[in-house]
Amino acid sequence: MTPLRILPAAAALLLLLLTTAAPAQNGKKIYADYHGVRYTRAHDGKLGRWEMHAETAKSKTGRKRLCYNADFTDAEGRHDIAAVAYPQVGMQSNLDPDYIEYQILSAKAAGIDGFFIEWGFMDHENDKLLRAMQPVAAKYGFEIGVNWCDGWLYYDWITRMHPEIDTREAKTEHYARCYQYLVDHVLSGPTAPVVNGRPVFYLFGPGAKPAEYAYAASKVRLPEGMAQPAVLRRWAEWGTLENDRYVPVRWSPEIESWKELGMIPTAWLPARVRPMDAAHPHWDHYAEPDDLIEFMKPFRDSVWMSADPAYTVKSGFVMPGMDNRGCAGWGGQHFYYIPRDGGRTYERMWEFSMASRDSLDMVFIASWSDYTEGHEIEPTVENGDRELRTTLHYAAQFKEMPEDTSGIALPARIFDLRKRSEYLASARRKTADADALIDRAAAAVASGDYAEAGTHIAAAETAVRALETTLKNRTLEVPESELRFSSDAVHGIRYASPELKVYLPETVTRSLIAARAHTGYVEFEYFDDAPTGDFVFLYSRTERQPKDIFATVAKFKTDGTGAWKRVRVELIPGNVLYDMNPGFTLLFKGKLKLRDVSFHYTLSR
């Protein structure tokens, strides 16, 4: 095992000369930050970052709170997610292998080589996300790295999981263990992110201080033959606004202290220093497109164009825009905005990096999936696949590869087929032939053979449609008048405090049991009363383990609009128990007024 060390200048220069002697396209990579974890009731029994409830009274915008009840859907099936844009394939679980496949194939088709998952420490939920992604990435020739948010380790998050790690010294010792874990399981192996023969990761901070990092790094041992990792250290100091012109920070003692440890200053989201004005009433601060370019110039001047041999991997940086109305600064109660400008902002960021492309080894994108901060490039309803096409356009220049856009739309078709086949299988249809075609299509997309992939997709769509025609479907509508409740309505209004049980008619329950497969939702109106700070819960009986997780059908809060709101909540077949034993179907629990409850199903045989 080789100790992790800071490369001396001479050794770094030699390694730099050796790695840059390879053909340019072999040494250049594109990675995208990956933000999670987002879940679904169907896959995980919870929602994760799709939901958000937070106070924002400190914001100067006048907005008092965030209330994104992601269990709620509208009449089109769109969930109330914590984001300003909606995923093109709908609200999915980051841990669903089909969704992971879709994202990886979409990224590959756009010229992206890997994801850097925002990661804090071993056994955190983001570590589970990392481990879920690795086998799919290995299957399709994709790389999985980390954007190490080591602040998570120094917050009390680690102490909640490991009470014995309760001092800064103990956290630094665990930092070393986490670093070794990354070396052994992320920075080496078939999915390791490697640029010019060197493993690389992004260090977001703001956790370890330089001395603590140096101590932890001194305890790490590298596998035999592994090159010293390149560490891209976030440098995103704020800058100032002078005479209506953004002026960036060009030097700071903090970044110098990290450079002394061999780290490479790398950009993150550009500063937003312009205060709210009449044209931007929804955000406390914003940036103009020109500000982004000014923000990037110090990286070009002091890192990209530098002959410093310690800069072994130089990374450009791009992002499409920002609108953090999904989170308001993660407790900071501050709304930020960078306009996408119809895709032009992303193009300008790429153009700035490409002007120095001969000096760059990689480009880092922020981000693939940060819906809450609103800088995702994953296809959305609002923006389509525009950002993926832009990524591919510049990836072709950067990596000297063909710009073949015919693969961009194929992963979404594959994902759609996966889900349709899944439903058919639940209805006891034999889907093996269709699934084999879908598998071949996915493999063809991963290898860049889009014509072959299209052929397999077309054949799979024909096979799936043929199976769908064999389904015998019928709808089942159950109005409130046919339901039984544990308490009577008062002037047409029912109260969920302390609880309200709802019972389906036996005939409906028998029909659901007899159906081979079904989809369904419960619809109701609730009075959006003054917030209490407490959640209202909707439970079912369930046999799915762990029951305390999968028994939750929905949880939500009121937002204080003083209006009646009509919503729908999905009833996940594998989660909700329907049987003939005595017991409720659903149970509302919390301070809530509701009315006009009804159930709606589509049954398949």
Regions found by a protein language model. Give the residues of each.
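Exposed low-complexity, polar/acidic, P/S/T/G-rich flexible segments that act as propeptides
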Residues: 589-605
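Glycan-processing catalytic domains of CAZymes
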Residues: 25-472, 570-574, 587-594
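Extended extracellular/luminal ectodomain segments enriched in beta-structured repeat modules
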Residues: 514-523, 579
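Solvent-exposed strand-to-loop "edge" motifs in beta-rich extracellular domains
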Residues: 523-531, 572-574
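Bacterial N-terminal signal peptides
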Residues: 8-18
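Beta-strand acidic-aromatic groove motif in beta-rich domains, primarily in extracellular
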Residues: 530-542, 580-582
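Glycan-recognition and processing domains
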Residues: 469-516, 530, 544-546
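Extracellular carbohydrate recognition and processing domains
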Residues: 544-578
